[in-house]
From Swiss-Prot:
Cofactor: Mg(2+)
Annotated GO biological process: CTP biosynthetic process; GTP biosynthetic process; nucleoside triphosphate biosynthetic process; protein hexamerization; UTP biosynthetic process
Subunit structure: Homohexamer. Can also form dodecamers.
Reaction(s) catalysed (UniProt annotation): a 2'-deoxyribonucleoside 5'-diphosphate + ATP = a 2'-deoxyribonucleoside 5'-triphosphate + ADP; a ribonucleoside 5'-diphosphate + ATP = a ribonucleoside 5'-triphosphate + ADP
Annotated active site: 115
UniProt main location, coarse: nucleus
Family label: Belongs to the NDK family.
Organism: Zea mays (Maize)
A Gene Ontology molecular function term of the record: DNA binding
Official protein name in the record: Nucleoside diphosphate kinase 1
GO CC annotations on file: nucleus
Record Pfam families: NDK (PF00334)
């Protein structure tokens, strides 16, 4: 099974969207493998977004991520990286389809509620950064009702 990293950003936490977001991933049939509520340090946020360090919006993004707690999660499932990105919606909420998290809950690209890994490689890197202890090793009893063998 594939894994992905999902982070509910400070605006999503402050607006009380944690349960709604978790519910959407669970209803799709994905498994929550790790979760923590974290106040992110500046140096950690800079490390997480290191690939964007040369972008003009980098410092604003870092300031946003450290402005309040985030919910960091690992989700597992078939094609969870690609499907997770579809559940989340486009980076710019105004380009996101209704029914996606950003399409339903965000209007500004600078307050777009959620982060999701954009590739398997990014997911592996982000999971290792945020969860060095690794995710929980368990399987839902619903597994055979969601996935064929």
């Amino acid at each position: 099974m594939e894994s992905t990293f999902i982070m509910i950003k400070p605006d999503g936490v402050q607006r009380g969207l944690i349960g709604e977001i978790i519910s959407r991933f669970e209803k799709k049939g994905f498994y929550l493998k790790a979760l923590k509520l974290v106040n992110v340090e500046r140096s950690f946020a800079e490390k997480h977004y290191a690939d964007l360090a040369s972008k003009p919006f980098f410092q604003g993004l870092v300031d946003y991520i450290i402005s309040g707690p985030v919910v960091a999660m690992v989700w597992e499932g078939k094609s969870v990286v690609t499907t997770g990105r579809k559940i989340i919606g486009a980076t710019n909420p105004l380009a996101s389809e209704p029914g996606t998290i950003r399409g339903d809950f965000a209007v500004d690209i600078g307050r777009n509620v959620i982060h999701g890994s954009d590739s398997i490689e990014s997911a592996n890197k982000e999971i290792a950064l945020w969860f060095p202890e690794g995710p929980a090793d368990w399987q839902s009893s619903q597994h055979p009702w969601i996935y064929e063998k």
